[in-house]
């Protein structure tokens, strides 16, 4: 099947992007270089095209109640203008996908409630099929909310200043995981237009994710870059999220790993009376304990551990690297991996098979990097 292009495909090429296929899309892997882009986000700000992500609305009577049957997080902890990170689960408690749920409140003339979900590109169709199948009796409308539009991620400590400079709008009143819809205009797009903006991201930095129409998206992209924001590709997005200890679906989490095993137990609210798919499996795991856990590893020396590299302990195979890279911020090799529970204590030494040699790796505290305000 031919890979799809985002509306910013040509715009990214004009900025010097090197493209790769990712989850069925042609996406920029880098522009000026991974390390430069990574450091720009850590120190200033960077802009990502994430229009490959799935964005869907679920609208009708009590959509949060309906979605609550599919996720382990208490969705009633958020209200209009707020959002939360959670996961879809199968019957075994395995993770079908991770997603963000945004409560849009009642914004329809029919007085219907609406929530927005943002899901991973490679899981989009399977996720929507799963949701529609299990909510088929709820009389809800599940619609593609992105259409042919653009989804941008502006990330970094200077993000708020950059948006204020370009949009002329102060966004300091949007808290972390807050969101709102606002009317704005640009120098190159003088007709005012609506954007959905959320203070969310996948880098470990402050930042925003912005949904808007294609023409406005192209204009905003160009004006931010002209204002000094660095265009960034998936390469930097991966190293940034890895340093921040954020899992990547298909690598660090999948339908055979549970939230407790993945270090996402904080997403599970078993104390609520709500029933959800996978709850029984998670209750059982709470009572019996877990056999493996996703840990952070620091690789000694200059070696880089990649996905699939074998991990040994006392000459026995004990696991595989799920994600690994060189950390531009820490200047050392870092990785994530599932290890047997008795090897997950911080400071434990294991060995990673990198090419033909065994390299020592030390279990470290997650995340590798955390922004100090």
Swiss-Prot record:
- Xref: Pfam families: GCV_T, GCV_T_C
EC number per UniProt: 2.1.2.10
Q: Which GO terms describe its cellular component?
A: cytosol; glycine cleavage complex
Q: Which UniProt keywords apply?
A: Aminotransferase, Transferase
SUPFAM superfamilies linked: Aminomethyltransferase beta-barrel domain, Folate-binding domain
Reactions catalysed: N(6)-[(R)-S(8)-aminomethyldihydrolipoyl]-L-lysyl-[protein] + (6S)-5,6,7,8-tetrahydrofolate = N(6)-[(R)-dihydrolipoyl]-L-lysyl-[protein] + (6R)-5,10-methylene-5,6,7,8-tetrahydrofolate + NH4(+)
Q: Does the keyword Transferase apply?
A: yes
GO MF annotation list: aminomethyltransferase activity; transaminase activity
One biological-process term from Gene Ontology?
glycine decarboxylation via glycine cleavage system
Q: Say which domain of life the source belongs to.
A: Bacteria
InterPro entries reported for this sequence: GCS_T (IPR006223), GCS_T_bac (IPR022903), GCST_C (IPR013977), GCV_T_N (IPR006222), GcvT/YgfZ/DmdA (IPR028896), GcvT/YgfZ_C (IPR029043), TrmE/GcvT_dom1 (IPR027266)
Q: Which HAMAP family match?
A: GcvT
The text of the family note is:
Belongs to the GcvT family.
Quaternary structure, from the entry: The glycine cleavage system is composed of four proteins: P, T, L and H.
What does the function comment of this entry state? The glycine cleavage system catalyzes the degradation of glycine.
Q: What is this protein called?
A: Aminomethyltransferase
Annotated source species: Prochlorococcus marinus (strain SARG / CCMP1375 / SS120)
């Amino acid at each position: 099947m031919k890979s799809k292009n985002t509306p910013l495909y040509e715009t990214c090429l004009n900025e010097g992007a090197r493209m790769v296929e990712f989850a069925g899309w042609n996406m920029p892997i880098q522009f000026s270089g991974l390390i430069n882009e990574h450091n720009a986000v850590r120190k200033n700000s960077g802009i990502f095209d994430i229009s490959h992500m799935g964005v869907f609305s679920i609208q009708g009577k009590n959509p949060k109640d309906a979605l609550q049957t599919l996720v382990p997080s208490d969705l009633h902890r958020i209200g209009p203008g707020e959002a939360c990170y959670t996961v879809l689960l199968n019957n075994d408690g395995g993770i079908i996908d991770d997603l963000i749920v945004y409560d849009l409140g009642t914004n329809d003339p029919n007085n219907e409630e609406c929530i927005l979900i943002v899901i991973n590109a490679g899981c989009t169709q399977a996720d929507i099929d799963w949701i529609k199948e299990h909510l088929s009796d709820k009389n809800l409308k599940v619609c593609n909310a992105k259409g042919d539009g653009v989804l941008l991620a502006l990330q970094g400590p200077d993000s708020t200043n950059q948006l204020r400079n370009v949009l002329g709008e102060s966004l300091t009143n949007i808290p972390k995981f807050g969101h709102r819809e606002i009317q704005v205009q640009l120098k190159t797009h003088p007709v005012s237009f609506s954007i959905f903006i959320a203070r969310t991201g996948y880098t470990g930095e402050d930042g925003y994710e912005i949904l808007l129409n294609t023409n406005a998206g192209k204009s905003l992209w160009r004006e931010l870059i002209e204002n000094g924001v660095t265009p960034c590709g998936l390469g930097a997005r991966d190293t940034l999220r890895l340093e921040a200890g954020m899992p990547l679906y298909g690598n660090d989490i999948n339908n055979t790993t549970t939230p407790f095993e993945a270090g996402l137990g904080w997403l599970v609210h078993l104390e609520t009376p709500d029933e959800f798919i996978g709850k029984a499996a998670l209750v059982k795991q709470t009572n019996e304990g877990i056999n493996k856990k996703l840990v952070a590893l620091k690789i000694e020396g200059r070696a880089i551990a990649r996905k699939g590299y074998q991990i040994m302990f006392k000459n026995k195979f004990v696991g595989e690297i799920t994600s690994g890279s060189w950390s531009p911020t820490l200047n050392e090799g870092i990785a994530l991996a599932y290890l047997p529970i008795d090897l997950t204590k911080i400071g434990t030494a294991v060995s990673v098979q990198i090419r033909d040699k065994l390299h020592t790796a030390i279990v470290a505290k997650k995340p590798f990097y955390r922004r100090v305000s």
